[in-house]
Amino acid sequence: MSTGAFYISSLLEKMTSSDKDFRFMATSDLMSELQKDSIQLDEDSERKVVRTLLRLLEDRSGEVQNLAVKCLGPLVGKVKEYQVENIVDTLCANMRSDKEQLRDIAGIGLKTVLSELPPAATGSGLAINVCRKITGQLTSAIAQQEDVAVQLEALDILSDMLSRLGAPLGTFHASLLHCLLPQLSSPRLAVRKRTVVALGHLAAACSTDLFVELADHLVDRLPGPRAPASPAAIRTLIQCLGSVGRQAGHRLGAHLDRLVPMVEEFCNLDDDELRESCLQAFEAFLRKCPKEMDPHVPNVTSLCLQYMKHDPNYDHDSDDEEQMETEDSEFSEQESEDEYSDDDDMSWKVRRAAAKCMAALISSRPDLLPDFHCTLAPALIRRFKEREENVKADIFGAYIMLLRHTRPPKGWLEAVEEPTQTGRNLNMLRAQVPLVIKALQRQLKDRNVRTRQGCFNLFTELAGVLPGSLAEHMAVLVSGIVFSLADYSSSSTIRMDALAFLQGLLGTEPAEAFHPHLPTLLPPVMACVADPFYKVAAEALLVLQELVRTLWPLDRPRLLDPEPYVGEMSTATLARLRATDLDQEVKERAISCVGHLVGHLGDRLGDDLEPTLMLLLDRLRNEITRLPAVKALTLVAMSPLRLDLQPILAEALPILASFLRKNQRALRLATLAALDALAQSQGLGLPPPAVRTVLTELPALVSENDMHVAQLAVDFLTTVTQTQPSSLVEVSGPVLGELLQLLHSPLLPAGVLAATEGFLQALVGTRPPCVEYSELISLLTAPVYNQVGDGGPGLHKQVFHSLARCVAALSAACPQEAAGTASRLVCDAKSPHSSTGVKVLAFLSLAEVGQVAGPGPQRELKTVLLEALGSPSEDVRAAAAYALGRVGAGNLPDFLPFLLAQIEAQPRRQYLLLHALREALGAAQPDNLKPYVEDVWALLFQRCESPEEGTRCVVAECIGKLVFVNPPYLLPRFRKQLAAGQPYTRSTVITAVKFLISDQPHSIDPLLKSFIAEFMESLQDPDLNVRRATLTFFNSAVHNKPSLVRDLLDDILPLLYQETKIRRDLIREVEMGPFKHTVDDGLDVRKAAFECMYSLLESCLGQLDMCEFLNHVEDGLKDHYDIRMLTFIMLARLATLCPAPVLQRVDRLIEPLRATCTAKVKAGSVKQELEKQEELKRSAMRAVAALLTNPEVRKSPTVADFSAQIRSNPELTTLFESIQKDTASGPSTDSMELS
């Protein structure tokens, strides 16, 4: 016998002792053993442990009984399945015992065992088998009405089982339903309540037929509002409807037209508890079935408005109320103390249910926001005076919900011609602000902490939606903030909330609004800085930092004299900084606050400046505070006050140098930023020995291992080169070696390249230059020029562009050398002995040098570039076209007419010449292009009918770039082309519009927005190519600048959805030898339409009717391979973004996924077909996994059946598990770049 088994055996022996203390201690020790993962029981030990624990459930000592029942939980996972079933059988038998205590223990035991059973999703069948075993016994226990205690315990356990394992118990659902329905008529309220809960869980998991039976039963049992019926019976049925609505509301949609009018009638009966249940049912219906509730919204809104003010036992005299608001705060507090209170008054529950229902109404119907602002908002504001704390919190919550839905979407763009709906909503909200202030003015000083917290939350949300709207009411807000900051009799939470609100306010309101109130506001903030509770102090330091940053900004003249305040702020902050026993958060906030104080007001610190800097230096030496200290030092160094930092530089620089060796990325990044700021601000004041110490650490940081670190290192090198070039002598060689190696990386980010260009220019810009121009050019070009043979360019294409940019940067820094460089490049480009790589680099360098130093030898250059367009190397041809355009942009009078003439004269080279024109149009200044607009416009539109799609695409891009030259003149001309042009011309014009859209704000946006509706009419064009181009343009707008199209979606979406449908007239059969091949000409258009739908999910979710949207997603799940892949990804996103509508139709959505996952590949399929099918399965299973993250989805019988099918199929199980691991290990890769 092992040591563990022997120990268990000795415990079991003590558990049978006659001494209850022995039994208790032994059972406690067994509990500890069972909780260990390492414990292993043999079969004999299992049997003995189970038998002994079950016997102890009947122990005379209640303490021993309670401990024994707790042991059952960990025991379940340590014994075999038949032992668990033995435990369950015994507990079920004990449930029917005559002894009340034993029945109670058995009930607790069953709940404990059920809670510890492994979920069905893990593949274990234990939970299902155990539940099936006890369901029948629970049913009979519920049906026997002799003992109510047994009934209640059985109903509790049944509810727990159904909530966890509803669907797998499908065979029992009918018997459970028929057992539970009669209990709705039980004379015992507790039985009825537990039955309502159980039926709610059953409704979520049962079959459609049983659900219909349940719904019909509830509807049929509800009497007419005037028919005689027991109020208790009606309340129970309405509560049951509410429970079903909360648990399975997505299945109630089809029954709502019958249910809602009846519930409305009952809501008007004089029974507050019934009214509460009716309103709770409406809330569930609105949240789960917003589409089906649409016809009933006006009536529900009316009921909410009526019952939100339902307070029959209290007289709210509005005239008195207004008069009271003018009284002083002492009278206000007296009135607050005399609040009405009546324990028998239930009307507050009705008001709370109405407020919650109103919040559900707002969140489920954002499309009705204008109506809500007219009807709900004033009513909510009037009810801010609510006397019941819980109700008031829900009223605040409903108004906050309205604010959140009014918040403009990201990237919102107001139209110039007419305000959008978003703008009108904001205007309506702006008109409400004075009313909100008036309603909450007294409440900001309410005795009740929760009320004040609600006010702060509401104002924070309001300031976020309408920045600047609270400025004229600052006196009221400051008064309320100060009141809470000085409230030491309540929890410190209210001070933290007040501070957080003040910090947010400083970020949204203009600084001038705070100036008159600073003498009042600053003392309580200073007191909070010194607060002994670390969270209050940390929050206060953050506020102080924001005060300094906002009231004395560095980019504008000071409008407020800091002299009266700077001493007090400095003293309070330094006191916190000097303390050594502080919480880490307070230390970091104090350091940051000092950084802002010195950076913004250092010139007013006088003699306190040097001690403050020394304190910062001291924190720099401390490992715990060094990162915030580095950031604070950066703030100080970057300050335009140009403070004298000499007292700390000699010691600080070596410390900073040591940080560059630390294996802490955040510290290295912050240190490099600090060093660069110091070098820029202090320049020659930096001690050269200390600078050299820092520089020796830099070569190791210029590496592609971390591009961001490399960029900051190069930026610092540039600054040092400009301020102390002599310090660079020793490290310039190693640094250049690393930098040139970095330039050979094909993944070089634009920021690193720009930093490198700046550094190279700094090297040759010093007098004398740190490194000679010719030497740097040789170093840059050596890897290309020294390449042996001509096996192609050798290096990655991107590397050539990087090297060319650096050559151009050097030429710009040394204008006297540029002409010679250009001549050498032309010679290299035309030399027959030059390799492909040399020619590519020469042309790309000429393109860049031409931009900064002129085009060099004109006639010869044109000839060389034209000849290169006929090169056998594709890389050389592309580089020459690029160079022709870029060089031409620098000398339009000479090059552009020449380029246009060549396009006319050389149709065979048209594609390359159009690429050159595109580069010229993109690189030239718009004003310089104006004289050539008409010629270029005419030439481009002559080529819109090219049969080559690639050519038409380049033409479209050229047209787009040309429009930027004079948008008001050229953009309207698109109308004529769209109306009169041929199909190819129309598609080219629409494609050109796509190139007018960027993800950054642009001056053309308002003008473009006014034309979008006309462009989108092309979705009705008879030509497929035009419709596809329109969808591509629309997708680009939705992805990059959704504000352009948001307000047009009502008109666009029906046309978009039309394009997702399969058109049989576009499907044809093509004979290929003995085989027939099906071609779907509409596939590309459908695919473009589904890509638009995906983009809409990311940026315009609030404008979509999700039920209609899902109809088309459902169709896409059965479409072509490419479209199914798109819709699987969409469905995975929808499962997260819109769980409620997805849940409503999950039974229909899961079938196409099941069909894909279980599809068999045809015999003899080629490898490509096998791979496509495998990827399709994987994508479908990802969608399944995303759906299953919603616990409500798992309750669906169809989903439960498919889950069981996955678990029973080893191949599907492996696939599902691998997807779950991928999801757990990192973010999903199922994102699409559709721009």
From Swiss-Prot:
Which domain of life, per UniProt? Eukaryota
Residue numbers bearing the N-acetylserine modification:
2
HEAT repeats located where?
Answer: 2-39, 44-81, 83-119, 129-167, 171-208, 210-246, 254-291, 326-367, 371-408, 431-468, 516-553, 564-603, 607-644, 647-684, 689-726, 730-769, 771-812, 856-893, 895-930, 932-965, 966-1002, 1006-1043, 1047-1083, 1104-1140, 1156-1193, 1203-1235
Listed GO CC annotations: cytosol; nucleus
- A Pfam family annotated for this chain is HEAT
Enumerate the Gene Ontology biological process terms: SCF complex assembly
Q: Where in the cell is it found?
A: Nucleus
Q: What GO molecular function annotations does the UniProt record carry, in alphabetical order?
A: TBP-class protein binding
* Matches recorded under InterPro entries: ARM-like, ARM-type_fold, CAND1/CAND2, HEAT, TATA-bd_TIP120
Q: In which tissues is it expressed?
A: Highly expressed in embryonic limb buds.
Modifications made to the protein after synthesis: Ubiquitinated and targeted for proteasomal degradation.
Q: This chain belongs to which protein, by name? A: Cullin-associated NEDD8-dissociated protein 2
Bias class Acidic residues marks the residues at 317-345
